[in-house]
């Protein structure tokens, strides 16, 4: 993330934090209340004890009446106990809300990814920006995570300042008696001005030094971003990935990881973090603490001299010293919070740069009219496409038309444009040149959700989630159980379904349930196919979803799929050409262009064609 050297103004800082707070309150209503209440109690309770303790010391140093001493002691115990109990209750509430906030902030990112144009979602710049946001959060919790801290510190600072002022004002109004001799000089206005200037200086210089430390820390965050990403990947992500654990053990990848982490070295001896802690960051914070100690010493001398002169009793000494130093500390906390917010504003800016990525894909208004006759005609007219940021055409001058109810197979070598063709058909991307027509109308003129609704797709990198089997098939917790069961049986999952004690209610995977079941790659593909069948859309597309199956199982599923597809238009992508023999038409892709089109027999008859070469290249492994 590139930051402006001068940073954000206070107005911009408060504006972006207000926006962030609104977003947090929207997804987690009332989320900040426990932090506010806890801060008030945390800041106010010490002053009550300070005032009561001063009264107790005054009584001890004068009349020492047992009943009065007992009264003050009981008050101190009662107030301390009540404050501790209240803080414990609020702390519990705060911890629950803190966990909720940490989880719910992910909702904003999820919502954005779900609303974002797929082209932007798939763009490398978007991925890099989101990775930077993650690294900022991992670095020191920058971004949304700090909002609860600011609420706490701001309320605590304001409450502390008001409480300290109430206990301190009499320090400057009480006069040393004239009988105190030279100590009456403490009544001179210059002493008052001097003490106030010292308080102001420490209050301002302390946060300035802390702000300098934050600034250095932020600069460091940019410098070590890649190193922190490497460390986080190997230290936190890889160990939990059980699917890669076999490779790690077999090939001793942990040694490679350790070497990589040592090479980037951001936390060890001599690392950028260590150097910053020993220089700018460490020295700035140490100097800020030293100034606070100097203030405490000067205030102690001033208060003790006034007490010695007879301005007030000895009990007030602890009251005034504690109040003045606490006043300075809370004022410094308030200013430090502002400095911290200015630093955090830059990280929030990165977050909102991501959240504010506009959707540029044209949204039409026509409906696709869920036709009962399923008469949909699709045509690619001179379509060319290249991925954002690339100079290479993934598809070039593609012309193709397929009729309703037909079976179309798309074949070709890796990188020939097969999956790109499907992405354009499903309007995950729009072509740079040419048109894709549905019933003679440019697909961009249809409502996006309506258009997407006519497709059931099983991508080669499909995803199942840790939810019940039936919910995975239906895409909803409420579904037609008979229909879901039939879809699974049609997809070849009947035997495994019968072996599942809970049937459709069986939880997939163990991430969220100890009773979850693990499914093999082939079984997962059958579930994904069942999901496509359950949707019952007029177009069904299989983008190499059976790669984890053996050739015989794949051929069986495709043959059965041809039966259950009925009058649907089916499009198949497969590297195994034998699985596509039953299709009405086969399109051969090569380097982004359709170079052959026809039936299996027609294409095989062309001995100089690409299809013939591909067919025989595969056939040699299945014939003697």
Give residue spans per PLM region:
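Membrane-integrated ABC transporters
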Residues: 1-46, 61-72, 90-94, 122-162, ...
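Helix-to-loop junction immediately C-terminal to a conserved catalytic motif
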Residues: 426
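ABC-fold ATPase nucleotide-binding domain signature/coupling loops
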Residues: 437, 494-527, 536, 621-624
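Extended non-transmembrane interhelical loops and adjacent amphipathic helices
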Residues: 1-18, 99-145, 224-273, 345-358, ...
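Primarily ABC-family ATPase nucleotide-binding module
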Residues: 249-254, 352-406, 486, 563-566
């Amino acid at each position: 993330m590139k930051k402006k050297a001068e940073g954000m103004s206070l107005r911009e800082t408060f504006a972006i934090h207000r926006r962030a707070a609104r977003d947090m309150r929207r997804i987690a209503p009332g989320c900040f209340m426990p932090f506010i209440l806890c801060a008030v109690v945390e800041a106010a309770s010490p002053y009550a004890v300070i005032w009561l303790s001063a009264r107790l010391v005054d009584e001890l140093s004068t009349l020492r009446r047992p009943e009065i001493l007992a009264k003050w002691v009981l008050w101190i115990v009662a107030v301390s106990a009540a404050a501790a109990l209240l803080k414990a209750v609020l702390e519990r509430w705060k911890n629950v809300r803190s966990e909720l906030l940490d989880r719910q902030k992910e909702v904003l990112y999820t919502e954005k990814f779900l609303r974002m144009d797929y082209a932007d979602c798939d763009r490398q710049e978007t991925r890099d920006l989101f990775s930077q946001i993650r690294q900022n959060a991992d670095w020191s919790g920058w971004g949304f995570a700090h909002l609860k801290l600011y609420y706490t510190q701001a309320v605590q600072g304001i409450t502390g300042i008001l409480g300290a002022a109430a206990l301190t004002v009499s320090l400057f109004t009480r006069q040393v008696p004239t009988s105190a001799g030279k100590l009456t000089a403490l009544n001179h206005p210059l002493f008052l001005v001097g003490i106030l200037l010292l308080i102001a200086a420490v209050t301002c210089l302390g946060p300035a030094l802390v702000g300098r430390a934050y600034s250095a820390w932020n600069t460091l965050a940019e410098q070590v971003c890649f190193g922190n990403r490497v460390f986080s990947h190997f230290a936190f992500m890889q160990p939990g990935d059980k699917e890669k654990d076999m490779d790690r053990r077999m090939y001793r990848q942990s040694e490679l990881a350790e070497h990589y982490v040592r090479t980037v070295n951001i936390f060890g001896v001599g690392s950028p973090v260590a150097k910053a802690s020993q220089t700018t960051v460490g020295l700035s914070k140490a100097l800020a603490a030293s100034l606070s100690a100097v203030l405490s010493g000067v205030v102690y001398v001033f208060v003790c001299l006034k007490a010695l002169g007879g301005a007030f009793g000895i009990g007030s000494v602890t009251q005034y010293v504690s109040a003045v130093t606490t006043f300075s500390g809370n004022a410094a906390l308030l200013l430090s919070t502002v400095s911290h917010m200015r630093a955090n504003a830059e990280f929030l800016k990165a977050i909102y740069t991501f959240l504010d990525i506009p959707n540029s894909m044209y949204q039409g208004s026509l409906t696709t009219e869920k036709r009962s006759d399923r008469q949909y005609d699709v045509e690619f007219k001179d379509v060319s496409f290249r991925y954002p940021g690339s100079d290479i055409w993934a598809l070039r001058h593609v012309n193709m038309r397929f009729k309703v109810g037909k079976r179309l197979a798309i074949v070709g070598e890796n990188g020939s444009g097969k999956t790109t063709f499907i992405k354009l058909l499903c309007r995950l991307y729009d072509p740079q040149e040419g048109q894709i027509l549905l019933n003679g109308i440019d697909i961009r003129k249809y409502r996006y959700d309506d258009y997407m609704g006519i497709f059931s797709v099983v991508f080669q990198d499909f995803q199942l989630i840790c939810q019940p089997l039936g919910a995975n098939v239906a895409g909803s917790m409420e579904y037609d159980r008979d229909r879901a069961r039939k879809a699974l049986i049609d997809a070849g999952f009947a035997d495994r379904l019968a072996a599942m004690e809970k049937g459709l209610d069986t939880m997939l995977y163990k991430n969220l349930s100890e009773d979850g079941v693990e499914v093999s790659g082939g079984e997962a593909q059958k579930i994904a196919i069942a999901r496509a069948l359950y949707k019952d859309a007029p177009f069904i597309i299989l983008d190499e979803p059976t790669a984890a199956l053996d050739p015989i199982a794949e051929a069986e599923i495709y043959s059965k799929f041809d039966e259950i597809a009925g009058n649907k238009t089916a499009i198949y992508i497969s590297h195994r050409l034998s699985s596509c023999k039953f299709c009405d038409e086969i399109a051969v892709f090569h380097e982004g262009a359709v170079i052959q089109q026809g039936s299996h027999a027609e294409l095989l008859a062309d001995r100089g064609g690409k299809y013939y070469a591909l067919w025989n290249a595969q056939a040699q492994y299945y014939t003697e």
